[in-house]
Structure formats: C-alpha cells, structure tokens
Design a protein with these regions (language model features):
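Intrinsically disordered, low-complexity regions of eukaryotic proteins
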Residues: 7-9, 22, 73
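Glycine-centered coil/turn sites that cap beta-strands in beta-rich domains
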Residues: 1-18, 44
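C-terminal tail/sorting-segment detector
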Residues: 4-5, 52-78
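Short, glycine-anchored, charge-dense loop/turn motifs used at functional sites
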Residues: 19-26, 59
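Glycine-centered tight-turn motifs at strand-turn-strand junctions
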Residues: 11, 25-54, 65-70
Length: 78
C-alpha cells in the first residue's frame, strides 16, 4: 500500500490518476472531485482500474486542478 499525501490551498475540483512508466493510465483515484482547503491522504493498494494487482515498479501520480498539473514518481513494491 502507498499513501499519497497532498495539500489543497483553497476549495477546488481535483483529479488524481496513476500512470505506468510507459505513460498508460492504470488507475483513476478520483475524477473532478471537490475538496476544501487542507491536507489529505489517499491510499493506493497497487490495483489498476480493473482490480488487478500491478507489478512492482515506478509509477507516476498526476494531480490536476483548475489549469495546474503536477506529476510525481512513486515506487510500488508488494
């Protein structure tokens, strides 16, 4: 399991997606969800959108809010 921490500075709609190293979207954590300001955590248990366990490796977390896009690498190890 991986815990993904993020901060929201003001109320906004946010999407969070996970991509494999080849750039293929493997999981939508949430899509266009409204968050108030604050600190948040999402847990990812290493499964794709079909519920299949992914392989160990490096993945990209993508946050999209308004016109801002942030990406960061995470490493998943079972």
């Amino acid at each position: 399991m991986i815990t993904i921490d993020f901060e929201i500075d003001r109320p906004r709609n946010v999407s969070m997606h996970l991509f494999d190293i080849r750039g293929r979207k493997i999981r939508t954590i949430f899509e266009d969800q409204t968050f108030q300001s604050g600190h948040f955590q999402e847990k990812w248990y290493g499964k794709n959108d079909r519920g299949i366990q992914v392989s160990n490796g490096v993945y990209m977390v993508q946050f999209i809010s308004d016109k801002k896009r942030i990406e960061r690498k995470i490493t998943f190890i079972k």
